[in-house]
Regions:
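N-terminal regions immediately upstream of nucleotidyltransferase
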Residues: 1-33
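Non-catalytic terminal regions of proteins
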Residues: 275-380
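Short alpha-helical scaffolding segments that buttress acidic/His motifs in well-ordered protein cores
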Residues: 236-239
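Short catalytic/ligand-binding loop motif for oxyanion handling, primarily in non-cytosolic enzymes
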Residues: 48-50, 78-79, 113-116
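Conserved NTP/Mg2+-binding pocket subregion across the NTase superfamily
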Residues: 3-15, 82-204, 210-234, 244-315
Length: 380
């Protein structure tokens, strides 16, 4: 029996085995081995560290997303678009069937895997995965990186995505009836502390693919360099524990609002501390953050990368007066620029935000928030 969830029963792990078999059979019907090489389960379940939700009646349920990497043969763009369309339909079918998000990556050509850069999205799965369909050796050419190969930019990318979970949590808590969203809010508070832990370990060169090992390693660095909250280590441990043993919250909306408020305070402090480490300065304020961000150049600066960035920015915001430097950065730069306003209520004028996010001068705050979310969904 394969181990997917360490705190799940033998029956639960056998159930997930059956889910994998079922998905593999769907794949076999939909795709030819001439076009796709392998379907690989990553994420917590792929590493053998998936979560199990124990309900009051003794039932065990999937809780984490099922994250799959799709490894393709060398195919033309038209064929890839056809595959992507099938995967999109399959995502919706399987997510509805199993009650969790079943996500498929974009197709990754097998002959490009040896050239992958050390991104966090690949660091974890290459250290723990399961091929459920196709070539069992499909990932053998992916480089085996060390923790210090992960650049600090991986930490700030992670914080951007987890920050959006906090943004949506705050939005849900402002609703007249937030009760249907309490699980989402509790989950994203824990995920924020997971991300803060992981960001510190990345910057310190001590990141590890295993959740259990990260729980041990986070006690080693001088946390005071990043956060002043003396309870952070306990919150970090609780966040990591939640990854393995999730639960449904019993707190009231008001109690969750109080937890979220403290989480945002910690997250803001950590966010700027990680960026300070990224830029090699002792501390940051908003003005310094924006100035250094404006002068930052992407590490991927080949002529092809710069041309691609220019085309993406041109599509998103059109051609407007400003620095060429803004157009040749990957568009995620615009999200970093505006995140302190969106998440921390930083005093950035709407007239400055509008051109950054590709809206006309005079755009109101709600339009800017909606625009930010749409850009984040595009570049997440």
């Amino acid at each position: 029996m394969k181990l997917y969830a360490p705190y799940g029963s033998e029956g639960f792990n056998l159930y997930i085995d059956g889910v994998m078999d079922s998905i593999a059979k769907r794949f076999e019907k939909l795709f030819s081995r001439d076009e796709l090489s392998a379907l690989v389960l990553g994420g917590g379940y792929g590493r053998g560290e998936g979560g199990v939700l124990h309900l009051a009646d003794g039932t065990e349920k999937l809780y984490n997303d099922l994250d799959f990497f799709v490894i393709s043969k060398q195919t033309n763009p038209w064929k890839n678009s056809q595959i992507s369309l099938k995967l999109k339909h399959l995502h919706h079918e399987l997510s509805d069937e199993y009650g969790v998000e079943v996500d498929f990556s974009a197709c990754m050509p097998i002959n490009s895997l040896d050239k992958l850069p050390p991104y966090l999205i690949w660091y974890d799965p290459i250290n723990g995965y399961q091929v459920i369909w196709g070539n069992k050796h499909a990932l053998h050419t992916v480089p085996r990186w060390e923790a210090n190969d992960l650049e600090p930019v991986e930490a700030v990318k992670l914080l951007l995505n987890r920050g959006m979970g906090l943004y949506f949590s705050r939005k849900y808590l402002s609703l007249e009836k937030p009760e249907p969203h309490l699980d989402f809010i509790n989950r994203n508070i824990h995920k924020a502390y997971q991300a803060m832990t992981e960001a510190i370990l990345i910057v310190e060169g001590q990141y590890h693919w295993s959740v259990k090992e990260r729980m041990r390693l986070i006690s080693i660095p001088d946390i005071g360099k990043y956060l002043s909250n003396p309870a952070f280590l306990d919150l970090a441990q609780a966040g990591m524990d939640f990854k393995l043993k999730p639960y449904l919250p019993t707190e009231s909306p008001e109690e969750l609002k109080e937890r979220l408020s403290q989480t945002l305070i910690d997250f803001e402090e950590l966010y700027y501390a990680v960026w300070a480490a990224f830029f090699g300065v002792s501390n940051l304020n908003l003005d310094t953050y924006h100035r250094l961000l404006a002068s930052y150049k992407d590490s991927e600066n080949s002529l092809m990368s710069l041309a691609k960035n220019f085309a993406l920015n041109l599509r998103d915001i059109g051609l407007s007066p400003g620095s060429l430097n803004e157009y040749i950065k990957y568009p995620r730069y615009r999200l970093f620029y505006a995140l302190p306003w969106l998440l921390f209520d930083a005093p950035i004028s709407l007239s400055n935000l509008a051109p950054i996010l590709g809206l006309a001068h005079g755009a109101d705050a709600e339009s800017l928030r909606q625009r930010y979310v749409s850009l984040w969904q595009r570049y997440n």
